[in-house]
């Protein structure tokens, strides 16, 4: 556990050192080359200048040490000459007095040690014998005995490190007629001026080093505030202007040429800003004109750039593709178009881009017809036109014009169906009339009167059928014109009874119960009598046509109150008469309910069992609109249908 803790600590220290090294490397790499060269030059100059006092100090120290060594040798020889006779006479008291006197009279002596011939301490000052044993290694003297013997009275100079301060340690043998009497060890303090000069030299070196760096830093700061800062401000301003930001200004209190440069820069930026504002206003005005023009176009318009991103789209295109509330400007067109449109449109767009960029050919306008069949049926006519830079023939964008031809296609289909139906309906009675008349003409001698009357009756019936068909077409044409139909007070009950009497026999033949339910005292309504008769006839006729035997048809009328708003927002109750024609017929699907009132459309187009021109309900809708009302339908497939509309009650009622 202890070893794992140590490993964890070592790993943490290693990671810490790695982080520091990496940060230093990153810091150094972020420094510019010019700054690195300046820093290295400053470091070399500062080290060189600060090393000069140290060199002088070293030379002075060597000279002082030589002087101290000579002084120590002379002093030790003088002391040895005086001590040798005393040591020879083994006069310890005299030796003690002499050495103490010599020690006290000479301030430069740090200590005096006297050893006998066996290397034992004979006398020491100012240390005791125990201290000498602890501080000095006596084995050194044992090693020197042989050397001392041979070198006679030659002093040996050492520099001990077991005492504080600069000390010259001198060892001199005490010989008498080549007999070793002992060893004298003197410690002499070094010249105090040497220590003082060393400290002064160190302080001067540090001061020189710091002064050089301080001067460089102050110079760099002065340069940064007086030259570098305005240059950086100018560089930033130039970059901003190059990027299109003309609001950049420099406000620095400088005079001279630098101040003139700043002033001219600000003046240039101000002129560019005014020029940009003028261009923006002009472009905005032109864009507004273009958008207004595009928005008034009935067709959808989309402008793409060369990367097929939307630049402009008008209201018609937004409504066609359901882009209300979506900000598609700057987005890829394929991200917002339905999938089936993309499948047909995107290859054409890619083909235009490819021809203009790869083949360098000018692509003419392309026309595409797109039919949607999935969610809803729509037909679009799409025109793709390239937008080129005619100076360099480079593709700048693609203009897409979208024409919604759904209604046109549907009308063409309905018209074709109508023509087919009318042609068939006209051909059938005409063929029947012609056949029976030709038969009467060719075989009139062989036919009896009963057969002739029967043929004439059939021809007359077909003539009536042909007349109704022509009348329906004429009625619809007349109703869709601007012809005015006067509305006046009329008896609705009378019109209902007249219509019911007309169709009562047909209902009886089909075993259908035709029932009327009229509210008592029903007031007169405001309408056109002949047109109201036509409404009732068409609706009852349709009910009879689509109701099977044993079915029921109910015609119901009653009064209702309809709320309308006056100018002061106070509700105004308007009395109306509601007319309902309900049956238990085949019913109408929800899909067909939305189109049942369209022109030229018949429900039998989907049933294929009944006859008709498909104009009846369209005529009814137009007549009711002439009466300032709307017709409504509620129907369930195979359960029946109910048509109802409201008519305004006449004021004189």
From Swiss-Prot:
Domain Histidine kinase, chain residue ranges per copy: 421-651
Ranges for domain HAMP: 225-277
Record PTM Phosphohistidine, positions in chain: 424
Annotated InterPro entries: HAMP_dom, HATPase_C_sf, His_kinase_dom, HisK_dim/P_dom, HisK_dim/P_sf, PAS, PAS-like_dom_sf, PAS_fold
Primary enzyme class: transferase
Protein known as: Uncharacterized sensor-like histidine kinase ycf26
Species this chain originates from: Pyropia yezoensis
Membrane-spanning intervals of the chain: 39-59, 207-227
Membrane topology note: Multi-pass membrane protein
Pfam families per the UniProt record, alphabetical: HAMP, HATPase_c, HisKA, PAS
Alphabetized NCBIfam families for the sequence: sensory_box
